């Protein structure tokens, strides 16, 4: 016994297959873009030390100002790239009062997530998770934080400055 399908069903199936192929090709392209972007980023910022150095340079490019007493005098803090106000003794890390404040993942991974979100069109948190080998919900949470920052829901000029410098160095490679 043979089952005959109406010709409209075959046309719909062909349209579905065509749409599915386009979606898969776009997904492969995004995965390739994400992979290339991640490799380029790792050449510029390979470890936490270089990420903290870049963050501190961008954060205090106009000089240190204590967030507690507004003093501009400081000395080196306990941890690397932190500063201690000589007036009130408050220690401020490079990540304090930035989008990277209280970030539970390494700072270089957090910067890489921000870089991927800003430079790869429509990248999913699943793809970021796969690229960086970090839990999906961690990537989702930080991706959401970056997107809120980009939408103007928080006043983070620092993120834009950091990403512009990284983009400039990546383009030189």
Where are these regions (language model features)?
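Residue-level recognition of single "structural anchor" positions
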Residues: 13-173
């Amino acid at each position: 016994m043979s089952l005959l399908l109406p010709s409209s069903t075959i046309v719909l199936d062909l349209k579905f297959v065509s749409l599915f192929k386009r979606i898969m090709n776009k997904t492969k392209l995004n995965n390739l873009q994400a992979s290339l972007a991640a490799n380029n980023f790792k050449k510029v910022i390979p470890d936490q030390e270089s990420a903290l150095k870049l963050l501190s340079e961008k954060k205090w490019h106009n000089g240190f100002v204590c967030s507690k007493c507004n003093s501009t005098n400081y000395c080196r803090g306990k941890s690397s790239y932190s500063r201690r106000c000589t007036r009130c003794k408050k220690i401020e890390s490079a990540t304090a009062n930035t989008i990277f404040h209280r970030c539970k993942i390494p700072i270089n991974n957090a910067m890489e997530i921000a870089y991927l979100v800003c430079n790869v069109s429509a990248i999913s948190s699943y793809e970021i998770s796969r690229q960086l080998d970090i839990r999906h919900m961690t990537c989702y949470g930080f991706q959401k934080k970056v997107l809120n920052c980009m939408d103007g829901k928080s006043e983070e000029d620092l993120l834009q400055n950091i990403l512009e410098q990284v983009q400039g160095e990546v383009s030189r490679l």
